[in-house]
Amino acid sequence: MIPLGYFLIIGAILFGLGFAGIIINRKNLIVLLMCIELMLLAVNTNFIAFSQYLGARAGEIFVFFILTVAAAESAIGLAILVLFYRRRGSINVDDMNILKG
């Protein structure tokens, strides 16, 4: 059996990569959305690792719900980005300040 620390290190690396992607790339909204999803997957990895370590299944069930909500969030976010691209011709963050709401 793989020790818990290895899974936590993998989760921390994935979370760090997602966070670094957000910090480095602040222009493209699709890349920002992908980095946020990577961070969510890192958190899910930690939930699964702790669930296996403690012998409880609550963490795995929680991950299932997180993945469901994340899929819905991604679908809605991509739909908004497609509409924004059709209207403005760009998906840069700098162009988002012209949105009315």
UniProtKB/Swiss-Prot annotation:
Its EC number is 7.1.1.-. It is an enzyme of class 7 (translocase). Gene3D superfamilies: 1.10.287.3510. This is NADH-quinone oxidoreductase subunit K. GO terms for biological process: ATP synthesis coupled electron transport. Belongs to the complex I subunit 4L family. It comes from Coxiella burnetii (strain RSA 493 / Nine Mile phase I). Its main location: membrane. It catalyses: a quinone + NADH + 5 H(+)(in) = a quinol + NAD(+) + 4 H(+)(out). It is found in: Cell inner membrane. It is a multi-pass membrane protein. NDH-1 shuttles electrons from NADH, via FMN and iron-sulfur (Fe-S) centers, to quinones in the respiratory chain. The immediate electron acceptor for the enzyme in this species is believed to be ubiquinone. Couples the redox reaction to proton translocation (for every two electrons transferred, four hydrogen ions are translocated across the cytoplasmic membrane), and thus conserves the redox energy in a proton gradient. Keywords: Cell inner membrane, Cell membrane, Membrane, NAD, Quinone, Translocase, Transmembrane, Transmembrane helix, Transport, Ubiquinone. One of its GO terms (cellular component) is plasma membrane.
